[in-house]
Amino acid sequence: MGSGSSSYRPKAIYLDIDGRIQKVIFSKYCNSSDIMDLFCIATGLPRNTTISLLTTDDAMVSIDPTMPANSERTPYKVRPVAIKQLSAGVEDKRTTSRGQSAERPLRDRRVVGLEQPRREGAFESGQVEPRPREPQGCYQEGQRIPPEREELIQSVLAQVAEQFSRAFKINELKAEVANHLAVLEKRVELEGLKVVEIEKCKSDIKKMREELAARSSRTNCPCKYSFLDNHKKLTPRRDVPTYPKYLLSPETIEALRKPTFDVWLWEPNEMLSCLEHMYHDLGLVRDFSINPVTLRRWLFCVHDNYRNNPFHNFRHCFCVAQMMYSMVWLCSLQEKFSQTDILILMTAAICHDLDHPGYNNTYQINARTELAVRYNDISPLENHHCAVAFQILAEPECNIFSNIPPDGFKQIRQGMITLILATDMARHAEIMDSFKEKMENFDYSNEEHMTLLKMILIKCCDISNEVRPMEVAEPWVDCLLEEYFMQSDREKSEGLPVAPFMDRDKVTKATAQIGFIKFVLIPMFETVTKLFPMVEEIMLQPLWESRDRYEELKRIDDAMKELQKKTDSLTSGATEKSRERSRDVKNSEGDCA
């Protein structure tokens, strides 16, 4: 969400006044007359003098609030406009001493009291300097106005100028106050939206301090690193979470049900509200008697227990949950599964990467972290995600299953554990083989078949970024590579094995995606299409297009590399020939000597 304060920024105009640069600042609330008076004051001309602005190439500039801004290098030149007083048949009410009617032509004359010394160069060639004007029937040409009359006129003009000045200052003050109030209101709104982010940062700092303290106090431990703090207690907020409840528009509600939903447009508060809406929309709050306040506390605590990793963060959690929600509607899963299964699918999707440290299972095992030791090298991260999920649910304030009978909770717990453990990509081939075997005679009434289908569904959602439009999917690739490179850099520094697809010196965006799309994503979604044909157009077609796009990108990269090699070869060859010529010249000079 943007600041919004830039719309209230005043405009600055630079004027060239006899070779001196004068800066004039005004707000968008000034009118053309106000701006012209400011320019007159800046240039030393009387107020209400008609002036024109010229650019450096003598083009005229309109004097109004929307006039184009300039810089000190391109100041505008100010020129007074010479207005020729045309004669008009105005009858003078006063008769001259000779009894004649004063209907003779008017002569141009400067008004007494406003005459200013003429500046050199004030009028360009081709302009007409105003001639002095003689009031009709009052004085003969060459006759001076009496001093008392001149003093009276000057006094009146001074009072009028003072009144105009006060009026302009009041208007400017009002505009400035309104401007500041609007900016302050916008800032208050923005600061309110940052409350959750600030609390999240505080929580992360606290966790880092506790982790550092735990590391420094640990001695003679075979584990190199610890991502756990045994004394950490997940304490949710006792009060109702402070994130605002957004009212989703009908367009947002409709878009939320589709895989094309743009997950990058939403702030954490808005994502929390969207997740809350999903539970209400699917009837889970109603069917399982979930307290709405408890649901909000649970979502807030889940948000707090996702780390700020480049990829495995709360936005990824929302991305997976939203894809699961869209598949429920796309494939009409509520007709195939019970509400308990829908609750398991949605809750497992939200919790599937809780407290992810940003380093995968391979690193955990090779570095002998506390997670790997605790779970005996068997899916250490996925086991940890499950443990954190049920630590949160163990808190009464966050237990969204508190009104479910013990047998029902046991079924939900076992289902969530099964699905979260299935997200370990080391088990991908095993799960796919089992599912393909069941696909030959798939039975929706068979519990084993349905469990495998749920495992495939959460796997599809977990790695479904390329199903989304290119502008939504591509930033996720950059985030994932950044996390991979962080891990490979750490593995290099610690002398651990480095996977080629994580090495910043070997992998590119195209090479990273082509194999994954061709051999993991497309086969898995093709299998799902056999049960749900509607998946082909909505999800499989974007995968084919993504594969073709990255293959084309790889061809371009390869061509550029080949061209670079040829260029380097030619350059090195030319350099070698130049060295040989230099040696030949030196040898010939030596022979001559």
From Swiss-Prot:
Changing M425A: Induces a 2 fold change in inhibitory sensitivity by BAY-73-9961. Keywords: Cell membrane, Cell projection, cGMP, Cytoplasm, Endoplasmic reticulum, Golgi apparatus, Hydrolase, Magnesium, Membrane, Metal-binding, Phosphoprotein, Zinc. Inhibited by zaprinast; inhibitor is however not specific to PDE9A. Specifically inhibited by BAY-73-6691 (1-(2-chlorophenyl)-6-((2R)-3,3,3- trifluoro-2-methylpropyl)-1,5-dihydro-4H-pyrazolo(3,4-d)pyrimidine-4-one). BAY-73-9961 has two enantiomers, (R) and (S), due to the presence of a chiral center, and both forms vary in their pattern of interaction. Specifically inhibited by PF-4181366 (4H-Pyrazolo[3,4-d]pyrimidin-4-one, 1- cyclopentyl-1,5-dihydro-6-[(3S,4S)-4-methyl- 1-(6-quinoxalinylmethyl)-3-pyrrolidinyl]-one). Changing E466A: Decreased affinity and catalytic activity for cGMP and cAMP. 3',5'-cyclic GMP binds at H312, N313, F314, R315, H316, D353, D462, Y484, A512, Q513. Its cofactor is Zn(2+); Mg(2+). Its EC number is 3.1.4.35. One of its GO terms (cellular component) is sarcolemma. PANTHER family: CYCLIC NUCLEOTIDE PHOSPHODIESTERASE. This is High affinity cGMP-specific 3',5'-cyclic phosphodiesterase 9A. It comes from Homo sapiens. The lineage of its organism: Eukaryota, Metazoa, Chordata, Craniata, Vertebrata. The gene is PDE9A.
